[in-house]
């Protein structure tokens, strides 16, 4: 069952060692996928891990590339994305206005960790040509305010 909002006492700025740690505490349940949630209820969390070249992160707005279309061996975008699967969960979040937890892979003390950035909401989405020349879904997220 997805939880929309903060988990336990975790707050923005908290750091997590790896994807397993995120999953175990319920911050982001999938251990590999970048989107947690369902088509019916929406996305409860996303991870920006540097896997998609079209992602953009700023404090006041995140442009999150949809999932799909990447070659699993090279990580490169090789086909157009489609409004299916986890992308439908993000679209549903835009429709419901529910908050999405955002986690971001960051450099920390010579290594990498996942930082909880806080709650965001999906304000819009559209298809656009990505850096590799294929159609990519772009989801815009802004900090969530009640």
Regions found by a protein language model. Give the residues of each.
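Compact mixed alphabeta submodule
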Residues: 109-146
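Acidic, glycine-rich low-complexity segments with interspersed aromatic residues
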Residues: 1-115
């Amino acid at each position: 069952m997805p939880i929309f909002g903060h988990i336990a006492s975790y707050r923005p700025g908290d750091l997590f060692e790896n994807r397993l740690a995120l999953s175990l505490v319920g911050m982001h349940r999938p251990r590999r996928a970048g989107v947690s949630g369902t088509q019916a209820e929406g996305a409860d969390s996303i991870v920006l891990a540097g896997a998609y070249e079209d992602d953009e992160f700023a404090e006041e707005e995140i442009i999150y590339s949809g999932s799909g279309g990447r070659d699993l061996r090279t990580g490169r975008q090789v086909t157009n994305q489609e409004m299916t699967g986890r992308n439908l969960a993000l679209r549903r979040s835009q429709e419901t206005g529910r908050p999405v937890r955002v986690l971001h892979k960051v450099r920390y003390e010579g290594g990498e960790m996942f930082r909880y950035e806080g709650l965001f909401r999906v304000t819009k989405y559209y298809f656009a040509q990505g850096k590799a020349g294929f159609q990519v879904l772009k989801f815009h997220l802004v900090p969530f305010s009640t």
